[in-house]
Regions:
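Conserved ABC ATPase signature
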Residues: 156-160, 164
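A short, proline-enriched helix->beta-strand linker immediately N-terminal to the Walker B motif
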Residues: 175-179
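Catalytic Walker B motif of ABC-type/P-loop ATPase nucleotide-binding domains
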Residues: 181-184
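ABC ATPase "signature
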Residues: 240-241
Length: 267
């Protein structure tokens, strides 16, 4: 029988900005190939949680483990050394809500950039420069084709729609082959008619067993694509569990209130 082997374990993470406690004792785990949706009203700490996982914010307390390696331990400052933090970030890919593409680079260059910078740090880069470059380019082209952007590789961000930019951003995150792909409200900056094309790509990634954490306002999507849903409220995880269970039989009054704002046909 298969043993439950979490790819990610988050234990007792807390985070304050000044006197404001934004994350309060957050714990959850994620299995390889699983999708977790994080829902909750604005200001509940969802984005801060993603930023902590991606080593963009330093938690005050708690432990983050990936593949059984302790990446962060609040009691051990040595786990947060600038030199290591960059490397630790590579376990996670983060897709931001407003794409954050570089305007001066084409779609293809945007996807290749991080990988090229990493390659330059390898000792054998100079002698294998050509092969490395063409390998990276080939991989980037493959990802853009997978995103349905075969004809857009040479376009700059200003020549692309929001939905296309977001798909370039997804390809860019995938290029580094992260263990876990994180999305922060991937559709909230898009026109409603472009939302579908981005959700479709994320759904395909889920079907291909990409391990993902998705912070989203799209309730139908959260329920549909996730194996596990986490409801955050005021910096706490108030309730978490199976999507159908949580959406149809929420245990907490606050969860019921939150979900009642979305009509049933939305999920």
């Amino acid at each position: 029988e298969e043993t439950y082997m979490p790819i990610l374990e988050v234990e007792h993470i807390s985070k304050s900005f000044g006197k404001t406690e934004v994350l309060k004792d957050i714990s959850f785990s994620l299995e390889k190939g699983q999708v977790v949706s994080i829902i909750g009203s604005s200001g509940s700490g969802k984005t801060t949680l993603l930023r902590c996982l991606n080593f963009l914010e330093r938690p005050n307390t708690g432990i983050i483990r990936v593949n059984d390696d302790i990446l962060f331990d609040g009691n051990n400052p040595a786990t947060w050394q600038e030199s290591q933090v960059r490397k630790k970030r590579l376990h996670f890919g983060l897709v931001f809500q407003n794409f954050n593409l570089f305007p001066q680079y084409t779609a293809l260059q945007n996807v290749m950039l991080a990988k090229e910078l990493l390659a330059k740090e390898q000792s054998d880069y100079k002698e294998h420069k050509k092969e490395i470059h063409s390998q990276i380019q080939k991989q980037a082209e493959g990802l853009l084709i997978q995103m349905g952007l075969k004809d857009r590789m040479g376009n700059y961000p200003h020549q692309l729609s929001g939905g296309q930019c977001q798909r370039v951003a997804i390809a860019r995150a995938l290029a580094l082959q992260p263990d876990i792909l994180c999305f922060d409200e991937p559709t909230s900056a898009l026109d409603p008619e472009l939302t579908g094309e981005v959700l479709k790509v994320i759904r395909e990634l889920a079907d291909n067993k990409t391990t993902m954490i998705i912070v989203t306002h799209e309730m139908a999507f959260a329920r549909d694509v996730a194996n596990h849903v986490v409801f955050m409220d005021d910096g706490h995880i108030l309730e978490q569990g199976d999507p159908i269970e949580l959406f149809e039989h929420p245990k907490e009054e606050r969860t019921k209130q939150f979900l009642s704002r979305f009509s049933q046909d939305e999920y």
